[in-house]
Regions:
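PLP-dependent amino-acid enzyme catalytic core
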Residues: 1-490
Length: 490
C-alpha cells in the first residue's frame, strides 16, 4: 500500500509516512493510485456499529494491524461523542439529515480530528521516528478547535492554529481562544482563510524552515484535510449513513443515493467520492456553496478562477476561494496524471485560475452536481425547515438544504450532511427565526434554546465564562517568525 504525490509520481510514501508528513515536499497531496482496487463488503456491514464500519474502512487505507486499527477507533470515539451512534441519521420530509456535530466541539471536523491524533501516534511508533510532530493548521472556524481538542496533551505532538481574525463566528473564536492544553497555541491573522492556508502551505515547502525545526527534533504535519489521515475518517460516515437506510428498510442494498454536502475546501465531499470508489452506491454528490461559489463555477464550466472578491457570509466556514482537496479529485478524474495536475496547480499559483479539458469536466459532471445559496436564501431555508419539520439547521447545512430543494430527485433518497450545531452560529440562526435587539451571541444562545427547546451542546453552554488564553494577532507575513518564537512555549 503506497501513497504518492498528486504532482510527482516519484514521491512515494507508505501510509504511516504520508499521515506524518501531511503534504508532499513540492506541495502535492498524498493519494492512493489504486484507490478502489479493494472494495467494502457492504452486505457484511449491515447492522454493524460505527466502530466496526470504521475499522473496515481504515483497513483499505492504512497498513496498521487489526489490533492497532481497533485501538485507534476506540480511543478516538468511545465516550467522546454525545450520541451513541456518533453520526445519527434523522428523517425529514424531503430528505435525511446526517448529524455530524455530536463531537467535543460540535462540528463535523470532530469525526476526522478525533481519529487523526490516534493515527499519528500509531504512525510515529510504526516508523520509529524519534522526532516530535508540530501540527500546523489553518482554519475557517471549525477545524481549528477540533484539531486543538483532538491533539490537546497528546504525547510527542505540538499544535499551532491560525485563523482569520474577522472571519469566524464569535462562538468559534471563543472556542479557540479559551483552548486549554500544554501543547496548544492559537493565533489570529490579519487576512482571510485563504491567506492562512496559503501561509501554512508555503511553510510545508520551505526547506530552510523545516531544517530549523529538525535541528530541534521536530517535524511538520497538518491537521487540515490536505492530510490524508484527516480525510479517511470522513469516508466512514458516508458508509454508515447508507447502511442505516438499508438496515431500516428505507432503501434496498445497492440502491443509489444522493449526498448533498456544504463545502468550501472540498474535503468533506471528496470523502464521499472516496466512499463511492470503495463500493458505496452513489448517484450524485451535490456540492453546495455559499456566495463564494468558486466551486459551483468550476463544476459547471470547468474553469477554476479565484480572481474574485472574497465575500463574508453567514456560513463563514465555507468562505474559501482556494479549495485544496479539489486537487485529489482532479488527479483521479484525469487518470492519475501527475504531470497534468502539476501544470494545473502551477497555473493556479501563477494566474489564480486553471481550466480542465472537456473530457475531464464531463467525467466530473457524471458524478457531481453543484448549486449555491446566498445569505438571504440561507436564512429563509432555516426558517422554512424549522416551520415545516420543527428541525433547526445551522447556516452551512441550510445552504446544502436549499441546494437540495433546488435539485429535488424523487428517484433516489437524498442525505444532507449537517456539519455544525446551530449554536455555533447563533446570531444568524436566531435572526432567521425571531427578531433580535442587539444581543450578544451568548445571550442569543440561551434565547434560541428557550424558543426552540433544542439542547445547547455541553461544550458551548458556559463558553463565555471560560478564561481567554490565546490573544495573539499577527500579520499573515509573520507566521514563520511567530512559530519559531513560540515553539519554546509548547
Amino acid at each position: 500500500m503506497i501513497y504518492e504525490s498528486t504532482r510527482d509520481i516519484n514521491r512515494k510514501l507508505n501510509p504511516s509516512e504520508a499521515i506524518l508528513q501531511g503534504l508532499s515536499e513540492e506541495g502535492g497531496l498524498f493519494v492512493l493510485r489504486d484507490l478502489g482496487k479493494n472494495k467494502l463488503d457492504l452486505e457484511k456491514l449491515i447492522g454493524k456499529s460505527y466502530y466496526e464500519v470504521a475499522e473496515a474502512v481504515l483497513h483499505l487505507f492504512v497498513d496498521f494491524s487489526d489490533e492497532e486499527i481497533k485501538k485507534c477507533v476506540e480511543e478516538a470515539y468511545r465516550g467522546k461523542f454525545s450520541h451513541e451512534n456518533i453520526t445519527p441519521l434523522v428523517g425529514l420530509k424531503d430528505s435525511y439529515v446526517l448529524e455530524l456535530f455530536n463531537g467535543p466541539t460540535s462540528a463535523f471536523k470532530d469525526v476526522g480530528l478525533s481519529l487523526l491524533p490516534q493515527l499519528t501516534k500509531t504512525a510515529l511508533t510504526k516508523v520509529e521516528d524519534k522526532n516530535d510532530i508540530l501540527i500546523l493548521t489553518a482554519t475557517s472556524g471549525d477545524t481549528g478547535k477540533a484539531a486543538l481538542e483532538g491533539f490537546k496533551d497528546v504525547d510527542r505532538t505540538k499544535i499551532m492554529v491560525f485563523y482569520p481574525n474577522d472571519g469566524v463566528s464569535t462562538v468559534q473564536k471563543t472556542q479557540m481562544q479559551t483552548q486549554e492544553g500544554k501543547n496548544t497555541k492559537v493565533c489570529a491573522i490579519h487576512g482571510n482563510f485563504d491567506d492562512a492556508q496559503s501561509g501554512i502551505k508555503e511553510l510545508f515547502v520551505d526547506e530552510e524552515f523545516k531544517k530549523e525545526l529538525l535541528s530541534k527534533n521536530i517535524k511538520l504535519s497538518s491537521a487540515n484535510s490536505i492530510n490524508i489521515g484527516r480525510l479517511i475518517p470522513q469516508v466512514v460516515y458516508y458508509v454508515v449513513s447508507y447502511l442505516d437506510l438499508v438496515h431500516t428498510n428505507k432503501i434496498k442494498l445497492n440502491d443509489k443515493v444522493n449526498f448533498v454536502v456544504p463545502t468550501g475546501n472540498f474535503g468533506n465531499i471528496l470523502a464521499g467520492y472516496y466512499a463511492e470508489q470503495i463500493g458505496l452506491p452513489v448517484n450524485k454528490l451535490v456540492c453546495a456553496s455559499n456566495n463564494n461559489n468558486v466551486l459551483y463555477d468550476f463544476l459547471t464550466t470547468g474553469v477554476y478562477d479565484k480572481n474574485r472578491d472574497f465575500l463574508k457570509t453567514v456560513s463563514p466556514s465555507m468562505d474559501i476561494l482556494i479549495s485544496s482537496n479539489l486537487e485529489r479529485l482532479l488527479y483521479y478524474i484525469s487518470g492519475c496524471d501527475n504531470a497534468y495536475i502539476a501544470k494545473l496547480m502551477k497555473d493556479l499559483k501563477e494566474s489564480g485560475r486553471f481550466e480542465v479539458t472537456g473530457e475531464v469536466l464531463d467525467k466530473i459532471k457524471d458524478k457531481f452536481q453543484a448549486g449555491f445559496a446566498d445569505d438571504e436564501q440561507t436564512k429563509e431555508t432555516i426558517k422554512a425547515i424549522y416551520e415545516k419539520d420543527n428541525y433547526l439547521l445551522d447556516t452551512h447545512t441550510a445552504v446544502a438544504y436549499k441546494v437540495l430543494l433546488d435539485n429535488l430527485d424523487n428517484e433516489h433518497a437524498s442525505i444532507v450532511l449537517s456539519t455544525a450545531s446551530p449554536y455555533k452560529f447563533t446570531e444568524s440562526v436566531y435572526s432567521s427565526l425571531f427578531e433580535t435587539h442587539g444581543e450578544d451571541e451568548f445571550t442569543l444562545m440561551n434565547k434560541l434554546h428557550e424558543q426552540t427547546k433544542v439542547v445547547i451542546p455541553e461544550n458551548l453552554r458556559d463558553l463565555d465564562k471560560k478564561e481567554i488564553r490565546h490573544k495573539d494577532v499577527i500579520n499573515k507575513e509573520d507566521m514563520k517568525k511567530y512559530i519559531l518564537e513560540k515553539l519554546g512555549d509548547l
